[in-house]
Amino acid sequence: MAILSNTEFGILRLTISRAQKRNSINAEMFDTMTEALSRAASDDAVRVVLLQGGEQIFSAGADLEEMRSQPEVLDRAMTNFFAALRAFPKPVVAQVTGPCVGDALSM
């Protein structure tokens, strides 16, 4: 899975882990993060969400290959994720290390 998730000390850490594609985010990854936010919203053990990428790059943004081949699928997943992010009732922090471009900037 390209989104790693773990909760420790009240922090839900969502890590973009797709180094071979410069951490570009596809629909499945957006859906995974949306589902994680949905669960975390009602989980009292989660006090904050930390979004992070790899050591060399945060994210190259949306997966351009998927954008060309399945634009409606990626668009739906992105729309759902950013709506969930805007409505999320707890603090969200992006730990940006290295380049962060495209839709990743909106995080």
Which residues does each predicted region cover?
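Conserved CoA-thioester-binding segment of acyl-CoA-metabolizing enzymes
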Residues: 1-54, 83
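Histidine-centered beta-alpha loop that forms part of the nucleotide-sugar donor binding/catalytic region
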Residues: 17, 62, 97
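Residues that form or flank phosphate/diphosphate-binding pockets in enzymes
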Residues: 24, 59, 103
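Short, glycine/charged-enriched secondary-structure capping and boundary segments
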Residues: 28-29, 63-67, 107
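Generic structural signal for secondary-structure transition and capping sites
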Residues: 42-45, 72, 90
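Glycine- (often His-adjacent) and acidic-residue-rich active-site loop
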Residues: 53-84, 100
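Glycine-rich beta-to-alpha active-site loop
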Residues: 84-107
